[in-house]
Amino acid sequence: MQLKDGGTGMSRRRKHADSPARRSTPHRAAAKNCRPAAEPWLRESRAACSSQLRRAGTRSARRAQRQAAADGGRSPRGKETPVQIVKMDLLSCTFSSPNDPDGQTDIFWDQNSPMTKQLGKGRKKQISSAYSDEISHIVNRIAPQDEKPVTNSMLGVWIGETAIPCTPGVAKEKSRVKASCTKLKTKNREKELMKLAQQFDKNMEELDVIQEQDGKNHDFIQMTSKMGHLDNHKDSVQKPSGDVVPEITCTPVKKQMKGDSRISLAKAQDSSQKPFDQNVEAAFNAIFDGSTQMCSGQLSQDLLDAFLNNSKTSLRKKNALLQEEIITTETLLTENLLNKTPISLSPQIDTTVILNSCVTPCPKTPAAPDTQLDELTANDFEDDWESLLGSEPFLMENAEMLEFVPSTTAQDTCQKAICTSVGENDTITSRTNMNLGGRLRDSKVTLDLPSKTRNGELRNAGEHRFSSHPGDESRKVPFTGNKVSFEKSVTSIVSKDEDYVAVSNLEKVKEDSRNKCILNKHSSNKSSSYTRYPSKQSSELGVNLPLQVPTTDPFDSVFLGKENIVCSTNQSHGSKLNSSFDDWNDPLLASEMVEACHRLEATWDAGEVDDDLFCQACDDIERLTQQENKGSEESESVSYTSTRGSRSSSTASKQASQSAPSKHWNVVSSAVPLSLANKSQMSKPVTVQKRGRCGDGPNILDATNLSVCSKNSSDNKRGPVQVNSSKFVLGGSSNLNVNLGLMSTKIATNMKLSTQQLSHNSLADTAQNDNKILKLPKFTFKKKNPQLNQNHLVGSVPVGKISEDLGKRETVNSLLEANQQQSSINYSESLKPSSPDEEERNRKYSPEEIQRKRQEALVRRKAKALHTVQSAPISLP
């Protein structure tokens, strides 16, 4: 084998030795052997590897000769070893070492890299220089070294490249190619010029807008001056004739004068005055906004004193013309008001109210017939309300009930009062929406009487009364004209109050010697009545309406009070008022409490607020019950006085009421209830007992603090009999027929302005409330929820003070109980039989059940407090 191989090797060498190209044979052989492996790379880098291939071919040929000589022709494969070595050398030449930058370029750079484009040139200097340029470019990209050109112009501070950043701007574009300094300066100049041009465009647009605004201001000044001349001519031409009532309202005209008196009148002067430049005035109008026009228009160009005085004189003339016009239309407006008959009365409008109007500060100004005055005159009234209270007399009537413990501060925020102006022969009653919050200092609660004397006489005060029946066409209910004299009473603190009381003429109550009377109490579906019939003929209620002014109020506010004289047959009837109200076992009181609690059942929760309300109500019940029990014990000793003395005092009271026109009543201190917190009051009673139907009266008689007083014939003083804080409501269309016995019991109804429910004072629909007297419970468990108040707007009673639902059965409680020794009382009741549902409710809302619920509420409160303490995190110092 070896010889054979050696023979073949020798024959090969001979063959190559015999060839003419002997010297180049090793090189060609090596190139031929390594061409298949190195051919792709040789095409790209032939010039770079040519010298290495020559040296490799020479070394391989020498190794082959030495090995052949050592083997002696016995190893035929010795010649193939250099081919493999050359192969490795060529590969190592093409695939460079990791330290070679060319290899890194081929591996780590993409095809778009500038390095791959320079590999085929065969010069390492270019490769290294290109790589160094790329590194500097990367460094420049991280930290640019080219400085920005400095702009010396002030405009460049705001709109140039180096501008102060006011708004978040877009990131600047970064050029990948290194630009020369000249190119960078050229680009910055172009951008600066573009921004400067844009700024000039904005300035031109703003200038156009300013010029247009100046033109509008000039037109406005001319129009204002023309309107000023028209106003002067209009006031002089529009004089009301004797038959035509001009359809104007005083307040809008006054408001227009008030707003334009300084500008329009100043610009409406003649040319003889000092002229002023229109352009300068337009510039001032452009500088100042609308809120400063009243100042800048007058003070802009140094107007003369005579010019301003002339403006004030013309303003006074306009006021005088307006005043004459209002006074001329006073009587015509009165006739129009009296001739308008309301067809139906809504529950939200009082029967004494004809039209909604506002009283303005002008003296002798009647209520304007325009219903839009409420909205227009709100601001003027708030501005001038102090002058109104100081100059314009008005009477505030109210039909709200006292709280259990009324505070001494004035509770008169956001209330609606009724202003009544009474003339000598006619009555003008209007309703105003007045904001009485804040101050009632130096207020006068008087009537606008035409006479200037303090002690005047009010004639025919109750001549006209409006019927509360919607279907009744006759609006006036005539009464017999009587004179009632009034006197001025000045208290210690309220020093300038002139107190007048307009007393409606009631029908005189007939006397009856008999003491027997029948109490007929019946209930229907939606109405119930309480009527007291005498044995012979039914007689009606006499009402005493004095005015009560508290003297210890710190804010000088004035409360109006009413006292109702309920004529009973015996003095001892009043002593039993307390016992019937304080008795929890009374079925009537229990049923009322059940009704009150049942209405709250739907909204009652076991929350913290309801528990607090429940416990507070229970505490109030216990406290007031103890106070009234003491009052009832004291009243029992006073009540059983001599009947003869009571009879004589009743007779004296009757005679005094008949001689009222010629007698001035002295100021007598009335009884102070315990629930008034020792608040002294001065009472000026004017007893008027006339025949009249209470059902036709528009007033709602509310009784909250009952002070039953007895008159003794010996000392002619009134002593307190008892104090009762239960609540009564005498419906506006109800009839209370009381037989006047031999003595009278006075139940004083102290009313004052309340803060919450005066706006809900209204008369109800008479179809549902005819012949009805509502008895209110003594204590009211109420939450301030508007759902509970919706059912009572129809019931002609202030909202939140009734605890019965008017749609359900209404319980009727007797106002007076006759004495068993002197009178016999028969109760005839046609009440519904008690159903299982009512029995269940009676059991559910019994005093024991209420006490149990109270204990549960206390337990829940304690558990909640304990849970709060336990759940609180303990902080360690």
Swiss-Prot record:
Keyword Ubl conjugation: yes
Motif (RBM2 motif) on chain: 843-865
Short motif (RBM1 motif): ranges: 607-622
Low complexity bias spans: 637-662
Post-translational modification: Phosphorylated by ATR.
A GO molecular-function annotation: protein serine/threonine kinase activator activity
Name of the protein described by the UniProt record: Ewing's tumor-associated antigen 1 homolog
Example GO biological process: DNA repair
Cross-link Glycyl lysine isopeptide (Lys-Gly) (interchain with G-Cter in SUMO2) mapped to chain: 87, 416, 444, 510
Signal peptide residues on this chain, from the entry's feature table: none
Compositional bias (Basic and acidic residues): 454-476, 840-859
Motif ATR-activation domain (AAD): chain residues: 107-113
Species classification: Eukaryota, Metazoa, Chordata, Craniata, Vertebrata
Residue ranges of coiled coil: 185-213, 306-335
Region annotation (Disordered) ranges: 1-82, 450-479, 626-664, 818-877
Polar residues bias locations: 818-833, 868-877
Pfam families: ETAA1
Keywords: Coiled coil, DNA damage, DNA repair, Isopeptide bond, Nucleus, Phosphoprotein, Ubl conjugation
